[in-house]
Amino acid sequence: MATETLPELKKVLLNEDGQTALALRFRALFSLKDMGEKGDNGAIDVIAEGFKDDSELLKHELAYVLGQTKNFHAVKPLQGVLADTNQQAMVRHEAAEALGALGDKGSVAMLQEYFENDPLEVIRETCELALERIKWENSEAAKTETLQKSAYTSIDPAPPLPTDQAEGSDKATVEKLQKTLMDKSQSLFHRYRAMFRLRDIGTEDAVLALATGFDDSSALFRHEIAYVFGQMSDPASVPALIKVLGKTEEEGMVRHEAAEALGSIATDDVLPILKKFAEDKDQVVRESAIVALDMYEYENSNEVEYAH
């Protein structure tokens, strides 16, 4: 990472000259994230200033990043975004998820209110997950469960199921997890736990099991499947992701996540698909494809890390 100062990164992230490409703004954001993780509250404040932007994609990423910093200075701006009904649903959802990722017990009352009363399903479901995550994090189970050490550093909306509930990575375990993944009689949180256990198993069978999640009725659930595929970066998920991205009737939050996932997989067959959807009429899909193309170039270059 280049050693830009906070004012320089702020200038790029907030597009102060009006001419900064979105992909560069994303790179500045990831540099600011590193600073925020190390306790730099000024970096958190700069990220929070970005919520005034027009780009739904950028704002949702700002919220996601704030949730990953483990920095409680981010709580207040995230609460403000969740409460702001003028913000796009995808941005508000990401703010609620970020409050869950931070594990902020002080946000429980607010999350409960929006879980019970928000008119949008995606917000209600996200608040449900955030509440369950905070509850789990402060439970005995969090101390006693044996979780597989994950290859991923992200703070997820739910922890994976413990290994004693889904041991090994054989076909039978994957089939059992797939049934849990799609079992509507289970809580959303429990189904997410099955999702992240499948991610951590990481076999091709696990990828194919996860792909069945695209048939779920919840847009939030479908978008999380695409997000997980982006983390796994397994070429076996490409056909399912291309199919989702090509469904113009699908929710933008799902299609955009599919575009980003394809960018992180970065196989040769992905490039023409991303170029096509960089012209999509849905702004969040279009911008995601443009950022994904930048990620594709990075994945196929010798750059050390994706940051400004």
Swiss-Prot record:
Q: Does the keyword Cell membrane apply?
A: no
What's the protein name? Answer: Deoxyhypusine hydroxylase
Q: Does the keyword DNA-binding apply?
A: no
This protein's species is Yarrowia lipolytica (strain CLIB 122 / E 150)
- What are the annotated GO cellular component locations? cytoplasm; nucleus
Q: Where are the HEAT-like PBS-type repeats?
A: 91-117, 221-247, 254-280
Main localisation: cytoplasm
GO MF term list: deoxyhypusine monooxygenase activity; metal ion binding
Q: Which Gene3D superfamilies match?
A: Leucine-rich Repeat Variant
Give the source's domain of life in one word: Eukaryota
- Write down the required cofactor(s): Fe(2+)
Question: Which cysteines does the record link by disulfide bonds?
Answer: none
Q: What does this protein do?
A: Catalyzes the hydroxylation of the N(6)-(4-aminobutyl)-L-lysine intermediate to form hypusine, an essential post-translational modification only found in mature eIF-5A factor.
In the Enzyme Commission scheme, what number(s) does this protein have? Answer: 1.14.99.29
Question: Lineage in the entry?
Answer: Eukaryota, Fungi, Dikarya, Ascomycota, Saccharomycotina
Q: Which GO terms describe its biological process?
A: microtubule cytoskeleton organization
